[in-house]
């Protein structure tokens, strides 16, 4: 497992945007500087929930866009087609009963042998029950 390779879940990205900064590094803290990855599917989720993000943040659109710019510059996006079918099947089996939409994030974690950064406790519990324990915990907790 590569502790310097962290896969960022959509809920983490959303929380960073709602705070108005979009700064993932600030959420991590001073304990290290892992490389941050996410599947391209995050773009779809951000677009799908953009109105909700605007309402939840209470920020002017200009500030939210500045936070989005910061967030996107801190992430390395990985095309889902780069992940093997076998890994996709494995990830789907891990996620299917909790939330199949998390499959791209878990698949990328398995593909990169990294750590998954999520604050979805229901998902974490389900993944742990299935033997997946590759989670990232920020140093700034």
Language-model regions: role of each:
Residues 30-33, 40-92:
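PIN-domain endoribonuclease scaffold, especially VapC-family toxins
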Residues 19, 59-61, 99:
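Short gly/ser/thr-rich secondary-structure transition/capping motifs
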Residues 76-121:
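Active-site neighborhoods of divalent-metal-dependent phosphate/nucleic-acid chemistry enzymes
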Residues 1-38:
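Short, well-structured N-terminal submotif of metal-dependent ribonuclease cores
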Residues 24-26, 68, 105-106, 124:
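Short amphipathic alpha-helical segments and helix-helix/interface helices
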Residues 12-13, 42, 105, 122-123:
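Alpha-helix capping/helix-boundary segments
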Residues 19-20, 49, 129-130:
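Residue-level signal for well-ordered alpha-helical positions
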Residues 2, 38-39, 110-141:
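Acidic, PIN/NYN-like endoribonuclease modules and their adjacent C-terminal/linker elements
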